[in-house]
Amino acid sequence: MRWLPLLLIFLLAYIEISIFIKVAAVLGVAVTLLLVVFSSCVGISLVRNQGMKTFVQMQQKLAAGESPAAEMVKSVSLVLAGFLLLIPGFFTDFLGLLLLLPPVQKSLTLKLMPHLSVYRPGGWTGGDAANGNTFDGEF
């Protein structure tokens, strides 16, 4: 179990290199490198645009007194998508673009919502002070 993260990193590197070699064999190395750079740029601009929309929606929910938990899950998926799109390679770009799709974000939201709770500072309510008894003391 301790070796699982390291194994996943090596597996990801193997998949990325294999796909890169196959694409480069078909399209050529220069075109393949341009595709990797282009997909990263397009992905980052998509994440930036969707991130601003999500931020505005989160502010609107907070202003209306509603829970922004769904927007929080969406923002986490956007951050993860942005990270995956920054990693050079076609497989991680595919995973990052997959996380940008609204149906995938909705299914992630439905799976993660039961595990989220939004904390709002509101002070204490109730307790012994509510019945009028006050105790003075020194520390």
From Swiss-Prot:
It is found in: Cell inner membrane. Coiled coil: none annotated. It comes from the Bacteria. Keywords: Cell inner membrane, Cell membrane, Membrane, Transmembrane, Transmembrane helix. It is a multi-pass membrane protein. The chain crosses the membrane at residues 17-37, 78-98. Pfam families: FxsA. One of its GO terms (cellular component) is plasma membrane. Belongs to the UPF0716 (FxsA) family. This is UPF0716 protein FxsA. It comes from Serratia marcescens. The gene is fxsA.
